[in-house]
């Protein structure tokens, strides 16, 4: 766990369990030999907690125990050459039993209909959706030390499991680095003569790594939910809304840059990928946008590159400039092979004119742009555009209007003030509703707004919630 090479092998280990290939077995054995049983177990716990975020501590611990046991046995000198393949196949079969003690993936049942290597590869490919709402709450210093003194090993395992399941989209190397550093702090401070002073000092030292880990989890969760193409669209929308006075030429390279960083770093085994790439990105942000927006300029005055990134990441949408309405691009523009930026231009122009959170705009723009692009594949693209264009424009306008109604007053007010205005609007629309019914509606709508009406709303959760709310809109 102390070197990038080791972490690189750890990623191979994640696949070796399912694949059982000789060359992967050799990597696992080398890893086991280098780390030793204790650190290998810790690394496995982080890896499988991350891979199975819905698994219980007991389920993940049981899987880790089995993996470590088979690795120790099959990597021992004089072990049967078939040991590794036989044991991993048995582990795979055990995962398919109805009373399996191991954590379950969505899709496990389908994988279990397959046999041999095909089953192992199927299980290796299964992924949970990102945990968009981490529930981890750090205990008090006294609670931490009480649990640590009671059973240091059990405390460490529980912490690694809980933290890794909550922040599992952060790169594996970052999770390993942070959890190891955190446990080192606990070990030092809970045996210190002045635990409070010790925790204060050590947390200050850990602040940068903690922030990098949690923020990486957040941006990588969004990337995992959207994929590369839609992430690029999402990043373009956000920047257009934060700095609507900028030009496309200022914003598009930045949207592409952060998308490329996430593509490279979210699954990287290198511990310094995010730590190196994000500061470089903030320099580009400030070079391109600090003169275009006063809030951006303020963010660029922060002391560290990470603080600059956090400031710009959480920056809300700016006030809309007064601009003429934007029209859908023509078939001539869309179908022109030399005009590669036409869809980006439309996305940018619509976004900087529209007071509506990114999750809404990404949801409606992706199918709209795709539908327009499909006209280029038919023989008579002009007729296709003439037929689709007005309908798409009407659907887009209707969706935006409904979305703006759902999020009305949210970003401009405190939450208390927002709920007050929401209650007034609902009362005007539903004069016959009882106070109890109104209160229930206010809570329902405000819960939705608090999760889905800000610039960095969680895309997976909000996708289905937006559908439900639009069906019930008053």
Curated annotation (Swiss-Prot):
Keywords for the protein's UniProt record, in alphabetical order: Actin-binding, Disulfide bond, Glycoprotein, Repeat, Secreted, Signal, Transport, Vitamin D
The keyword Lyase is annotated on this UniProt entry: no
Effect of residue 445 to R: In allele GC*1F, allele GC*2 and allele GC*1S
Domain of life: Eukaryota
An annotated Gene Ontology molecular function: calcidiol binding
InterPro entries referenced in this protein's UniProt entry, alphabetically: ALB/AFP/VDB (IPR000264), Serum_albumin-like (IPR020858), Serum_albumin_CS (IPR020857), Serum_albumin_N (IPR014760), VitD-bd (IPR000213), VitD-bind_III (IPR015247)
Subcellular location: Secreted
Effect ascribed to mutating residue 436 to K: In allele GC*2, allele GC*2A9
A GO term from the CC aspect: extracellular region
Residues of the Albumin domain: 17-208, 209-394, 395-474
Signal peptide location: 1-16
Listed PROSITE patterns: ALBUMIN_1, ALBUMIN_2
Description of post-translational modifications: Allele GC*1S is O-glycosylated at Thr-436. The trisaccharide sugar moiety can be modified by the successive removal of neuraminic acid and galactose leaving an O-mceeN-acetyl-galactosamine. This conversion is thought to produce a macrophage-activating factor (Gc-MAF). Only a minor proportion of plasma GC is O-glycosylated. The potential N-glycosylation site predicted at Asn-288 is thought to be nonglycosylated.
Chief location category: secreted
Effect noted on mutating residue 445 to C: In allele GC*2A9; requires 2 nucleotide substitutions
Known tissue expression: Expressed in the liver. Found in plasma, ascites, cerebrospinal fluid and urine.
Protein family according to the UniProt entry: Belongs to the ALB/AFP/VDB family.
PANTHER family (alphabetical): SERUM ALBUMIN-RELATED, VITAMIN D-BINDING PROTEIN
Protein purpose: Involved in vitamin D transport and storage, scavenging of extracellular G-actin, enhancement of the chemotactic activity of C5 alpha for neutrophils in inflammation and macrophage activation.
Oligomeric form and interacting partners: Associates with membrane-bound immunoglobulin on the surface of B-lymphocytes and with IgG Fc receptor on the membranes of T-lymphocytes. Interacts with LRP2; the interaction is required for renal uptake of GC in complex with 25-hydroxyvitamin D3.
Record's protein name: Vitamin D-binding protein
Source species taxonomy: Eukaryota, Metazoa, Chordata, Craniata, Vertebrata
